[in-house]
């Protein structure tokens, strides 16, 4: 019987005939004892496969015997019908059984659908909506306000509220404190972070450099040398003393070496303003008399000669001095006023 079913299936299957290819599941002999090949092709465990296949074989055999008995009874009852091709077509029997059992099944529409489905709005509902809107637009009568009836439940609720307010009176203060603390925290969070002040180094231009020190020292040395060179000792003589006697009496003053440390050393506290704008050299407006007076005051400390200057010199005395110097062949120094 199974061979016949397989042959009929192969005849109906046109894809396998056209392509000349039989799928692997059709070539499997399900009723053969060699179940290991089926398990290897399907890809399941042997223990599970053997148990499942044995159960299917037993069920199929019992079902086939039951159907075979019914088909023989139906064939014997219908004697007028001649058998087709010497055997009863079992496919028709299976189809009839399937149709009868499938017709008795409950349909999915009646089983899964809701009992009360929402209806669609019909055209009759439009004037009803309009009538409702008209009713709403009309001025409604004033409804008298009625105070709700005070029941025992409302009284109990009021008592509980009063009791909680009296017992938990300190909670209000605690809540106020917590709210204030939260506000302080929020204010601290909202304030921008103050950046730390960068470490400020002292500017280098405030400190004297080696070049500036050398320049200032050289300027001090030049001024000291010029002042010592220009300071010529003058002896204060009386009017009656002649210039020759004056030259004979006066002796060259020994120059005392000036301590280099006093002028050369510069204090570290000299600022930029003093170095830039302080006048280290003498201006042009100062005359030679002022310089000579300043240097003569310094030279008086080293000399013990007590002399005084002549108040005024006439042009005659100056010319006589020049004549005497040329006659004797001696050279006279230039006057200080030149």
From Swiss-Prot:
GO terms for MF: microtubule binding
Q: Where is the composition biased (Basic and acidic residues)?
A: 1-14, 242-254
Q: Does the keyword Cell membrane apply?
A: no
- Spans of biased composition, class Low complexity? 216-234
Q: What coarse category fits the chief subcellular location reported for this protein?
A: cytoplasm
- Show the InterPro entries listed in the entry: She1
Q: Which cysteines are joined by disulfide bonds?
A: none
Q: Where in the cell is it found?
A: Cytoplasm, Cytoskeleton; Cytoplasm, Cytoskeleton, Spindle; Bud neck
Residues that the record marks as modified (Phosphoserine) are: 165
Pfam families per record: Msap1
Q: Where is this region: Disordered?
A: 1-29, 67-88, 116-146, 215-263, 284-338
Listed GO biological process terms: cell division; establishment of mitotic spindle localization; mitotic spindle elongation
What more does the record tell us? Present with 264 molecules/cell in log phase SD medium.
Entry similarity comment: Belongs to the SHE1 family.
Q: What is this protein called?
A: Mitotic spindle-associated protein SHE1
Q: Which organism is it from?
A: Saccharomyces cerevisiae (strain ATCC 204508 / S288c)
